[in-house]
Amino acid sequence: MFGIIISVIVLITMGYLILKNYKPQVVLAAAGIFLMMCGVWLGFGGVLDPTKSSGYLIVDIYNEILRMLSNRIAGLGLSIMAVGGYARYMERIGASRAMVSLLSRPLKLIRSPYIILSATYVIGQIMAQFITSASGLGMLLMVTLFPTLVSLGVSRLSAVAVIATTMSIEWGILETNSIFAAQVAGMKIATYFFHYQLPVASCVIISVAISHFFVQRAFDKKDKNINHEQAEQKALDNVPPLYYAILPVMPLILMLGSLFLAHVGLMQSELHLVVVMLLSLTVTMFVEFFRKHNLRETMDDVQAFFDGMGTQFANVVTLVVAGEIFAKGLTTIGTVDAVIRGAEHSGLGGIGVMIIMALVIAICAIVMGSGNAPFMSFASLIPNIAAGLHVPAVVMIMPMHFATTLARAVSPITAVVVVTSGIAGVSPFAVVKRTAIPMAVGFVVNMIATITLFY
């Protein structure tokens, strides 16, 4: 009991510090180290196996951190960095803008304002598989589709509400949290995406698109001061040829191709994600060179790939490791075992625990305005909890993953809401009033689809 009390105090302190914009990596790591020390001092057990212990607590703790860093950087971390590097490279050469320009063209042919509003959400979610920055995608859509939506009679608030939620489901083989979730669930990213994410995400996306249609139309009818003025139509700057739109999709094409070849026996196994990213990078370099005929500029642009890798290490990989340190602290002090025992005797079962954890992580995402910190803080705990409840880890980790990204779109302080609201000149608090119902619908469908399909 004393260990649980300490854990609760630490959790409250962590939440306060993160809300005050302290770096979550440092907060999580410090909390984990403190809990490991308390766990040993209170006699719950050691940090390392007795046969591997150095005899010094602080040395054992940092040896454990070294193990985590070594495992994550060489495996999951490298995949995340390669994906982040490729996304940065696509942004540098304009391929992301080409894809947005191409996919947004059919929408401009639709004249029904609320149908195009719902279609914008669906198209945005498709783009989200390849443009993995929510605020980046939001800004691109504000330039290309926001003026069209407003000119058709949709209010600015409705248009922003839909655009701000276009990455409310983070899915696909290029999305860093998906890669992390697959690793935690103990499976390859291709299996996680095609067998688990795709069916559930499809249900959620369709339900959210339909709810946007009715919710935004109802809000616009209710709002007596709705403004139908024309928004200035702007063109995307420096858009390369439209065939560049295939480049962000190339990793998915290569992954699908390798899965097919492995299935028919022409390859021993599907390509590793890092190999897919490097092959895509190589092909893109040749495309760039043959288009520009400038070897120096082509090679200089590749630096964006390595810059992106560094950014992912600093922002994401370190957060993953910090989350693991925190999870190790909770395990050492006995909190995880206590949660498992409590869940087993509560009668809630796997479904009840899954829903409660998804709600907790969703609330954290709304309060923090971020999905990464709460998800990566709790995700590492899931395998042990799931095993104790005799539930596959993926069945618990996936709804939590989707819950945190859905909830993020209801936070007035999350980056994509702030950025899109600022461009449109509307209040982020007014925007999240319009995103709350569609995201709540998505949350419920996420739970129902997961339970129905996989439990």
UniProtKB/Swiss-Prot annotation:
Statement: the UniProt record of this protein carries the keyword Cell membrane: yes
Spans traversing the lipid bilayer: 26-46, 112-132, 134-154, 160-180, 190-210, 246-266, 270-290, 348-368, 378-398, 412-432
Keyword Lyase attached: no
Membrane topology: Multi-pass membrane protein
GO molecular function: C4-dicarboxylate transmembrane transporter activity
Cytoplasmic side: 47-111, 155-159, 211-245, 291-347, 399-411
Keywords tagged on the record: Cell inner membrane, Cell membrane, Membrane, Transmembrane, Transmembrane helix, Transport
Tree of life domain: Bacteria
Known role: May have a role in the transport of dicarboxylates from the periplasm across the inner membrane. Seems not to be essential for growth. It is likely to be a cryptic gene, as no or low expression has been found under a number of growth conditions and when tested with a large number of potential substrates.
The family this protein is said to belong to: Belongs to the DcuC/DcuD transporter (TC 2.A.61) family.
Protein name: Putative cryptic C4-dicarboxylate transporter DcuD
Source organism per UniProt: Escherichia coli (strain K12)
Encoding gene (name): dcuD
